[in-house]
Swiss-Prot record:
Known pathway: Amino-acid degradation; L-histidine degradation into L-glutamate; N-formimidoyl-L-glutamate from L-histidine: step 3/3
Residues engaged in binding N-formimidoyl-L-glutamate: Y140, N315, G317
Name this polypeptide is given: Imidazolonepropionase
UniProt remark on cofactor binding: Binds 1 zinc or iron ion per subunit.
Catalysed reaction, written as an equation: 4-imidazolone-5-propanoate + H2O = N-formimidoyl-L-glutamate
Organism in which the protein naturally occurs: Burkholderia lata (strain ATCC 17760 / DSM 23089 / LMG 22485 / NCIMB 9086 / R18194 / 383)
Location of the protein in the cell: Cytoplasm
Lineage top rank: taxon: Bacteria
Length: 407
């Protein structure tokens, strides 16, 4: 690529709408690295002859980060949606053999090509909304071959689409049918066979567990965390979504990157998160879709200064959501978060939830030029509009990878 000065733009370099530069420019060298940014009037003379790209007054933010997804799976769970509308709870469906286990059956039956094609279709709407980094979990295979298949597909998505993919091994997502009544034996399999094999193949960036009364106990979760720690892998946790099981405090003891969901999180757990530097990842899509009523403790998270991220939690059972912008709106309308909070929740705090705050979530000299250009009058519109296409252009590594076609 040619060294380029992107200009005629309004810059929000750190995802905070109160920290902006009008009539700004970004200079990107031939490696796709930002070498200068600031007011156009202060552009150094050394960049005067570089190629120019006019963004026509668009707002520019860091590329968005979707830090919690289950994008790779087989089938749908539309039938369970009808059950929930009839009053059957998520927990009841799971106990009847539906829920996660029904997706496990469909995922095991699908080959890699089928899973890739289906996941690619789910990924593309996110890319068109300015997402340049995404986390993708396994957890719908629940045996070594199927978990490997899922993680391989996630890696392939990162190789074939203009997005950085971070993989999370979620083998401890649910108890597979063949281990019914033998949860400890399944955790043996996760810790002693699945995780070592997948880590040795370079398929795992982090490790997650579903710690809940319909998932895995604190003791079982800790065993997985110990196995991950021995491998030098960071951990994260699905915690306190349906009850307060104390998982967040355990996650904090292992300095987890994030604890996610958190509707039933208490102040002691929040204090532990703050001390450990663990990010709170809130998932309003799941809250909305399964009609939860227990709100995450936003005020307590604010009080203790715990960074809050937002994510789609895209999955077939509780959040079939393919819009990070709608997630922003939900964060504001359902959780009463502010516009600065939700914007930072999908930029720098989301990057921190992946342990990648040094690479994503901000536009600074020395970083890769990953950014999105928005056709809005104010950044509040990113959380305001519902369903309107707002992203005009996405740049990754200094190269345009998406441009909205008008007319």
């Amino acid at each position: 690529m040619k060294p380029t000065v992107w200009h005629h733009l309004r810059l929000c370099p750190h995802g905070h709408p109160d920290e902006t530069i009008d009539d700004a420019a970004i200079a990107v060298d031939e490696t796709g690295t930002i070498v200068w940014l600031g007011a156009m009037s202060a552009l150094p003379h050394g960049y005067a002859h570089w190629q120019r790209e006019d963004l026509h007054g668009a707002w520019v933010t860091p590329g968005l980060v979707d830090c919690h997804t289950h994008l790779v799976y087989g089938g749908t769970r539309a039938d369970e949606f009808a059950q929930r509308l009839a009053g059957v709870s998520y927990e009841e469906i799971a106990r009847q053999g539906g829920g996660i286990v029904s997706t496990v059956r469909a995922t095991r039956a699908a080959d890699e090509t089928t899973l890739f094609v289906q996941a690619a279709a789910r990924l593309q709407p996110l890319l068109a909304e300015g997402v340049t980094a995404i986390e993708i979990k396994s957890g719908y295979g629940l045996d070594l071959a199927s978990e490997r298949k899922m993680l391989r597909v996630a890696r392939q998505l990162g190789e074939r689409f203009p997005v950085t993919v971070y993989t999370t091994f979620l083998g401890a997502h649910a108890l597979p049918p063949e281990y019914a009544g033998r949860a400890d034996a399944y955790i043996d399999e996760v810790c002693d066979r699945m995780l070592p094999a997948l880590a040795d193949e370079g398929l795992v960036d982090a490790v997650d567990v579903f710690c809940e009364r319909i998932g895995f106990s604190l003791a079982q979760t800790e065993r997985v965390f110990e196995a991950a720690t021995r491998r030098g892998l960071p951990v994260k946790l699905h915690a306190e979504q349906l009850s307060n099981a104390g998982g967040t405090a355990l996650a904090a003891r292992y300095r987890a990157l994030s604890a996610d969901h958190l509707e039933f999180l208490d102040e002691a757990g929040i204090e532990a998160m703050k001390a450990a530097g663990t990010v709170a990842v809130l998932l309003p899509g799941a809250y909305y879709f399964i009609r939860e009523t227990q709100l995450p403790p936003i005020e307590l998270l604010r009080k203790h200064g715990v960074p809050i991220a937002l994510a789609t939690d895209h999955n077939p059972g509780t959040s079939p959501l393919e819009s990070l912008l709608l997630t922003l709106n939900m964060g504001c309308t359902l959780f009463r978060m502010t516009v600065p909070e939700v914007l930072q929740g999908v930029t720098r705090h989301a990057a921190a939830a992946l342990g990648r705050a040094d690479r994503h979530g901000a536009l600074e000299v020395g970083r890769q030029a990953d950014f999105a250009a928005w056709s809005v009058g104010s950044l509040a519109e990113l959380a305001y509009w519902i369903g309107r296409p707002l992203c005009e252009q996405v740049v990754r590594g200094g190269t345009t990878v998406f441009r909205r076609m008008n007319g």
